[in-house]
From Swiss-Prot:
Composition-biased stretches (Basic and acidic residues): 28-46
Region of interest (Disordered), ranges: 1-46
Name listed for the protein in its UniProt record: Uncharacterized protein ORF7 in nfe locus
Keyword list, A-Z: Plasmid
Length: 232
């Protein structure tokens, strides 16, 4: 069953993606994001950090769809959604992991599971070393004893958790069709990296291969990053 035939996505993905097609439009999504902004501030999160992160993302020169996706984590309380399940469900319904390419070589990732582990570690702002340990070698070589077992659920700071919700929020379009072009790798862009507390290290650090994976080439061109080309 594809997304077009669904009334609404079940499971953990349903907590991130609205189930009603009529409500899946830019206006209602942004109103939902505005409502989530207020809920998060009232939930005790640091208002100054919230405003700073909002300025980093929403004042960037990015599309309205990308801007909405960056706001989505503030709509969904972390306690309501198990991130691994939501990301795995989004992967099954959109097959986005099969379309990830290496920014330098243009090759696809040969193993989806550790790539998703790296994405989740990015989304929860674990930092370079623990992200590498969680990814089973996709982002960097693991040393014995440093591999971090992924727990069933993470408790990310709302404005720092981006990728898992970004996948799910763009999994279904207004008419229910799958939108591969909207599955953007936000953490490989420098504005998003700065908002996640990693600064330019996340976008430029070469021991970390996660910075090489990018989901959408039009998004890369918008940020003036080189377009991947496959070797002859």
């Amino acid at each position: 069953m594809n997304a077009h035939n669904m009334r609404g996505p079940p499971g953990d993905l349903a907590k991130v993606v609205p189930g009603s097609r009529s409500g899946w439009n830019e206006g209602s999504r942004c109103r939902q994001a505005d409502k989530g902004d207020g809920q998060c501030r009232n939930g005790g999160r640091d208002a100054s950090e919230h405003v700073e992160a909002r300025a980093l993302f929403l004042n960037s020169n990015i599309s309205s769809k990308a801007r909405f996706s960056l706001r989505t984590p503030r709509v969904v309380p972390s306690s309501r959604c198990r991130r691994r399940r939501a990301d795995a469900e989004a992967r099954r319904r959109t097959a986005h992991a099969r379309h990830d390419t290496n920014l330098r070589t243009g090759e696809r990732c040969p193993n989806e599971s550790p790539l998703l582990a790296a994405i989740l570690a990015d989304a929860t702002n674990l930092g370079l070393s623990r992200r590498a340990a969680a990814s089973q070698g996709v982002t960097a070589t693991n040393s014995p004893g440093r591999r971090m077992p992924l727990s069933g659920s993470f408790h990310p700071i709302a404005h720092k958790q981006l990728v898992a919700a970004a996948y799910a929020s763009n999994a279904v379009s207004m008419d229910g069709d799958i939108q591969q072009d909207n599955l953007n790798g936000f953490l490989t862009s420098e504005p998003a990296a700065r908002g996640c507390g990693q600064g330019r290290r996340l976008a430029s650090s070469r021991p970390c291969m996660m910075a090489s994976f990018h989901r959408n080439q039009s998004f890369a061109r918008a940020h003036r990053r080189p377009t991947p080309t496959r070797p002859d």
